[in-house]
Amino acid sequence: MKLTDLKFQPGVDKQDSPYAAGDDRRYVDSQLVRFHYGKPERWKGWSYLPNPNQTVIGVVRDTHSWVSLDGNRYLALGTDRKLYILEGSALYDITPIRATESLTNPFTTVSSSPIVTVTDSSHGASVGDFVTFTDGTTNNVLDGIEFNNEFEITTIVDANNYKITYSSNATGATAGGGGSVTATYQITVGPSTSTYGYGWGVLTWGLSTWGTARSSSSITLDARNWSLDNFGEDLIATALNGGTYQWDTSSGTGTRAVSLGATAPVASRFSLVSSDTRHLFLFGTCTTVTDAATQDDLFFRFSDRESLTQWAPTAENEAGSLRIADGSRIIGAVTSTGQILVWTDQSLHGIQFVGTPFTFGQRQLGANCGLIAQHAAVDVNGQAFWMGDDAFYMYDGVVKKMPCSVQDYVYDDLSYTNKNDIAC
């Protein structure tokens, strides 16, 4: 019997029925497979990162790798709870510090219980935040509990008291002990998943009673996300709707990321470095730099050239700001050939360097082609590809909707509440 060479088409087709796809010799399902030169090829597996003995706390939302000027390789990881640096096989916690307080006898222990109450006036902490206690000695033991450690805050009692949990029970009971202690608070953790908001301002004025949660909502509270980039050899990290921080590579892995300072915007959706012109962009940021209440989801700022601290425009610098008109908020951005591509939830825009006095200008490149999530776009050799709310798109000078044989399979089972967690 004559043998026939069966040639199958690359990719997976979930738009047609298995019977119809089979007629055209198309695959209808796959797992751990990629297509190379038109043929399926297995993934070659993965390994632990960094290793099984080290724990990454939280859900990783963004990663970024780079090489320092002295040749060291780094990988930054941003989770909903921490910010890390991986160098070699070692993982370092570089989560920024929110506040440092000097306390006196703040600990109250209960015999045979691992729960400790900490007193700190106007602590400003939330459940899930991390705090580290030090007292200048090798160890600070009270009733068998070693307090010179990092702890997760498990309960907020009130504005002046919270609770932490040790790994074992206290051997005694003390009301107000520990001596002179320094409490170092890391920045407030973010939510691990997106949820709907049901509080004040969700529905129309006067609906329901004061202090009562609303029964429905169209307001989404996004999960914590990060944007990570390089300014030279240093790391720039922005927490979604939070602050922007710098980790100085030359200071070493024993140091933490720090705020850009009092002159930088206090809240932004994300950041991006223009590698060609050496400006730092902050998108969805504050119209008044020091006031988080003025955060505008369509407004963006760029720093002076070669500066992370100069944000106020003057006649002698290149700092400035612009506002995008189409859409309700800026979702994401990537650097491309000769421009920065910026997406709102409705449209695509190009930002180009135009020189003095305006520094940068913008023009709209497409409408009804918004981005679904912060990390759902990529640029490859000047061509951009992204996932929208209803389809996949590309831009090569013109916005095009991409044909996709798995489109219904993807979108029919999509949780739009958690769409900002998507990464492509």
What are these regions (language model features)?
Residues 247-255, 292-319, 352-359, 394-406:
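Surface-exposed loop/turn elements that mediate protein-protein interactions on large endomembrane-trafficking
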Residues 234-246:
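Hydrophobic or amphipathic alpha-helical targeting/insertion segments
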Residues 327-424:
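Beta-sheet-dominated scaffold domains
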Residues 53-57, 260-264, 323-325, 364-369:
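Surface loop/turn motifs at the tips and blade-to-blade linkers of beta-strand repeat domains
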Residues 1-4, 9-10, 15, 94-225, ...:
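Small/polar beta-strand repeat architecture
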Residues 230-231, 240, 251-252, 264-266, ...:
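Active-site-adjacent structural elements in enzyme catalytic domains
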Residues 1-100, 187-214, 268-350:
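N-terminal beta-propeller domains
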Residues 58-65, 221-227, 264-274, 329-332, ...:
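Repeated scaffold domains used in trafficking and secretory/extracellular systems
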